[in-house]
Amino acid sequence: MAIIIDVEHYGGRRAYLAHLRARVLYAMGSYDWVRQIQWSAVRRVAFVCQGNICRSPYAGGRARLHGISAISFGIQTVDGSAADPAALRNAFNRGVDLSGHRAARFDKSLIAPNDLVMVFEPRHLVEIVRQGVTAGAGITLIGIWTKPRRPHIQDPYGRSDRYFQQCFSEIDLYIDALAKRLAEHHAPAGAAVMGCHSEVTSSLKNASSE
């Protein structure tokens, strides 16, 4: 019996192929280094995607609902851009308000020594390494901390509401897993990553105004 793959579940045919390639590289150990996280050192989580208008702001918003201090950036974005309308709508339907979000371009100077940097695709790792980022707590792929492992989370920008919901649903699972790991390494749960909330807000404002 033939196995039918719903490629839209991954964001389309090209996205599915990117997913397969990332899975193979992960299985070969190419991303073993991104599992070396100092969880007890984490004081803030920096989510990084491509444009900082869909995935990373949603992840940041969801993380803050868990009491996690979080900030988000884009590898290629225009500082001050609002969240994508489709992201805004689909996030709102899931209880995350992105109406006040303004995009900020990623720069290593904005990463603090105790930040955990979480990205959505292997190509984001390439750019972060190119910039010489040294995040004390670690740099990792958001989708490798649950099963099945998903080293590549396709950008929902320009795609259907169905895929937006699929993507955001997966991010919810990743943030749940993140919250549990942080709670295991900090007592009381989440306290250690909530202390720099004002610093996060200040960093966002400064990044958006540059």
Where do the language-model regions lie?
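Phosphate-binding/catalytic loops
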Residues: 2-39, 128-197
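Short, compositionally biased "basic patch" segments
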Residues: 1-4, 76-78
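Alpha-helix capping/helix-boundary segments
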Residues: 123-125
